Amino acid sequence: DYDWSLRGPPKCATYGQKCRTWSPPNCCWNLRCKAFRCRPR
């Protein structure tokens, strides 16, 4: 399952780029720059 959150810094990866890692661990911004995706290891 994916945990979505609107919290986080306004940093986005450009289209086709890998997501930037951020806290909480294993989270990154999605390419749509609307939220970051938290995924278990």
Curated annotation (Swiss-Prot):
Highest taxon in the source lineage: Eukaryota
Q: List the GO cellular component terms.
A: extracellular region
Keyword list (alphabetical) reads: Antibiotic, Antimicrobial, Cytolysis, Disulfide bond, Fungicide, Hemolysis, Knottin, Secreted
| UniProt-listed GO biological process terms | defense response to bacterium; defense response to fungus; killing of cells of another organism
Disulphide bonds annotated for this chain are C12-C28, C19-C33, C27-C38
Tissue-specific expression:
Granular hemocytes, small secretory granules.
Mainly localized where?
Answer: secreted
The listed locations are:
Secreted
Methyltransferase as a keyword of this entry, yes or no, is: no
UniProt note: domains? The presence of a 'disulfide through disulfide knot' structurally defines this protein as a knottin.
Q: What does this protein do?
A: Binds to chitin. Shows strong activity against E.coli (IC(50) is 1.2 ug/ml). Is also very active against S.aureus (IC(50) is 0.8 ug/ml), C.albicans (IC(50) is 0.9 ug/ml) and P.pastoris (IC(50) is 0.3 ug/ml). Binds to chitin (5.2 uM are required to obtain 50% of binding). Causes hemolysis on sheep erythrocytes, probably by forming ion-permeable pores.
Q: What is this protein called?
A: Tachystatin-C
Q: Which organism is it from?
A: Tachypleus tridentatus
